[in-house]
Curated annotation (Swiss-Prot):
Assigned protein family: Belongs to the lentivirus VPX protein family.
GO cellular component: host cell nucleus; virion component
Subunit structure: Interacts with the P6 region of unprocessed GAG. Interacts with host VPRBP/DCAF1, leading to change substrate specificity of the CUL4A-DDB1 E3 ligase complex. Interacts with host NUP153.
Organism: Human immunodeficiency virus type 2 subtype A (isolate BEN) (HIV-2)
UniProt short sequence motif Nuclear localization signal, positions renumbered to this chain: 65-72
Gene3D superfamilies: 1.20.5.4730
Keywords on record: AIDS, Host nucleus, Host-virus interaction, Inhibition of host innate immune response by virus, Viral immunoevasion, Virion
The name this protein goes by in its record: Protein Vpx
Gene: vpx
Amino acid sequence: MTDPRERVPPGNSGEETIGEAFEWLERTIEALNREAVNHLPRELIFQVWQRSWRYWHDEQGMSASYTKYRYLCLMQKAIFTHFKRGCTCWGEDMGREGLEDQGPPPPPPPGLV
């Protein structure tokens, strides 16, 4: 009888698999941020990033990858809720709405250029 469990392809070690997961996390955050600016104010995106980093990394002592993962979860929930409530944005940039008199926007989180 053969073993039904998946096997790691030859030549792949745990290190490579973990590295691939970190690369996936980076790519996913960048893609989510690029889409989020079309639906959420840039200030909100920046604040979620900054507060996530401050709480999970600085206060709780979690790793950078864990902090990025928690940020990803929060942003996915925010985007889901936005669409669930009936998105009417259709690609308009939400970046400066309501910020005209508050000076330049803060620097964006990684991947949001």
